[in-house]
Curated annotation (Swiss-Prot):
The lineage of its organism: Bacteria, Pseudomonadati, Pseudomonadota, Gammaproteobacteria, Enterobacterales. The keyword S-adenosyl-L-methionine applies. It is found in: Cytoplasm. Binds 2 [4Fe-4S] clusters. One cluster is coordinated with 3 cysteines and an exchangeable S-adenosyl-L-methionine. GO terms for molecular function: 4 iron, 4 sulfur cluster binding; aspartic acid methylthiotransferase activity; metal ion binding; protein methylthiotransferase activity. Its EC number is 2.8.4.4. Residues 376-441 form the TRAM domain. It catalyses: L-aspartate(89)-[ribosomal protein uS12]-hydrogen + (sulfur carrier)-SH + AH2 + 2 S-adenosyl-L-methionine = 3-methylsulfanyl-L-aspartate(89)-[ribosomal protein uS12]-hydrogen + (sulfur carrier)-H + 5'-deoxyadenosine + L-methionine + A + S-adenosyl-L-homocysteine + 2 H(+). The gene is rimO. Residues 136-373 form the Radical SAM core domain. InterPro entries: Elp3/MiaA/NifB-like_rSAM (IPR006638), Methylthiotransferase (IPR005839), Methylthiotransferase_CS (IPR020612), Methylthiotransferase_N (IPR013848), Methylthiotransferase_N_sf (IPR038135), NA-bd_OB-fold (IPR012340), Ribosomal_uS12_MeSTrfase_RimO (IPR005840), rSAM (IPR007197). This is Ribosomal protein uS12 methylthiotransferase RimO. Its cofactor is [4Fe-4S] cluster. It holds the Pfam family TRAM_2. [4Fe-4S] cluster 2 binds at C150, C154, C157. It comes from Citrobacter koseri (strain ATCC BAA-895 / CDC 4225-83 / SGSC4696).
Length: 441
């Protein structure tokens, strides 16, 4: 008879944004460290954890459906994540859920797991976790979360009510994690938070320490330190504070990627005021021009909302005019959707759905034309590409201008002598509005 003890198995579902993905990775790393197996199927698991998203109504619905599926297939379910902040809403639909915790409640999640599926016995000297921890991304890139929460109160958003005010991670801790990731083979770090440019504001940019050296807790100092690791560093979710200007020279010098993800949301000063967002559109255009003068290779990504309450045709036209002048490289656009608990719900003059749809189509048509023109400028040039996938037909990678999942790709047909994580030089042969095609130099 075998005396091998069966390891308890945990199923895991991770929904939502990269910030939620990082939370999932942390929970999974702790579970693996304690000796739990993480399995891909519900019926094979002793319990299922669902890390939910609650940002917009469609995300709430997806989360509730995932919880329901886990209950049907397994029966023992713990819920965490952003929707977990709305306990009553979950209990009303799924009363059989065992436990519910809010976002970044790692310790609570683990305590609940220990209660229902006791910790297994395992050899503490046998490492069950890779050096970089359990990652849900490919091995060659990783998200680095530098803070939690947000101090802004944008009227379309409920993140602060779910994740709280800004809490910056100690800079020494952040840099140590980055170093571990690089040592484990990561070639690209994507810096994320709810508000990356506010990093350190809550601690008055106090001085921390890394490897015995003093380092200021700020976005600029963080970028300076990350640049020493010799990998690609990409900034996401950058609020347009004045000090963002200070990172552009670092991009021009090649210290971090010339890529800025800066959600602007709209271009009408009146709508921006209703959103409780910065409203100096002329100033933003001047800054964009200045940034490009300092760093000609700069890629600008942004997101916008159309059909926000009170948006008139004149407001929308201001947005289109802004797009024409700014000529942003990568743009996402969302039709405004009411979110339970958001301040914008109480605003007058809600925009009809058919008007939102019509404006969204006009927005996308214009931006696709701009994006296609911007990418066409790259044809004939040589660029660096990091490889993401390789199969018998060729390789797929990304340029410095492309973040994983949300931007375009570079297709290298017939190029099979590479592996994920390789950075190679490519000549661009063709382009459309989103992607590039090229050949290895």
């Amino acid at each position: 008879m075998s005396n091998v003890t069966r390891q308890p198995k945990i199923g895991f579902v991770s929904l939502g944004c990269p910030k939620n993905l990082v939370d999932s990775e942390r929970i999974l790393t702790e579970l693996r460290t304690e000796g739990y197996d993480v399995v891909p199927s519900y019926d094979d698991a002793d319990m299922v954890i669902v890390n939910t998203c609650g940002f917009i109504d469609s995300a709430v619905q997806e989360s509730l459906e995932a919880i329901g599926e886990a209950l049907t297939e397994n029966g023992k379910v713990i819920v965490t994540g952003c929707l977990g902040a709305k306990v009553d809403q979950i209990r009303e639909v799924h009363p059989k859920v065992l436990e519910i915790t809010g976002p970044h409640s790692y310790e609570q999640v683990l305590e609940h797991v220990h209660h229902y599926v006791p910790k297994p016995k395992h050899n503490p000297f046998l490492s069950l976790v890779p050096e970089q921890g359990v990652k849900l991304t490919p091995r060659h890139y990783a998200y680095l979360k530098i803070s939690e929460g947000c101090n802004h109160r944008c009227t379309f958003c409920i993140i602060p009510s779910m994740r709280g005010d800004l809490v910056s991670r100690p800079i020494g801790e952040v840099l140590s994690e980055a170093k571990r990731l690089v040592d484990a083979g990561v070639k690209e770090i994507l810096v994320i938070s709810q508000d990356t440019s506010a990093y350190g504001v809550d601690v008055k940019h106090r001085t921390g320490f890394h490897n015995g050296e003093p380092v200021k807790t700020s976005m600029v100092d963080l970028c300076e330190q990350l640049s020493k690791l010799g990998i690609w560093t990409r900034l996401h979710y950058v609020y347009p504070y004045p000090h963002v200007d200070d990172v552009i020279p670092l991009m021009a010098e090649g210290k971090i990627l010339p890529y800025l993800d800066i959600p602007l949301q709209h271009a009408s000063p009146r709508i921006l005021k209703l959103m409780k967002r910065p409203g100096a559109v002329d100033r933003q255009l001047a800054r964009i021009k200045q940034w490009r003068e300092i760093c000609p290779e700069l890629t600008l990504r942004s997101t916008f909302i159309v059909g926000f309450p009170g948006e008139t045709e004149d407001d929308f036209q201001m947005l289109l005019d802004f797009l024409k002048e700014a000529r942003l490289d990568r743009v996402g656009c969302f039709k405004y959707s009411p979110v339970e608990g958001a301040g914008a719900n109480a605003l007058p003059d809600q925009v009809p759905e058919e008007v939102k749809e019509e404006r969204w189509n006009r927005f996308m048509q214009l931006q696709q034309q701009i994006s296609a023109e911007r990418l066409q400028e790259k044809v004939g040039r040589e660029i660096l590409v990091i490889i993401d996938e390789v199969d018998k037909e060729g390789a797929i990678g990304r340029s410095m201008a492309d973040a994983p999942e949300i931007d375009g790709a570079v297709y290298l047909n017939g190029e099979t002598n590479v592996k994920p994580g390789d950075v190679i030089r490519v000549k661009v042969d063709n382009a459309d509005e989103y992607d590039l095609w090229g050949s290895r130099v």
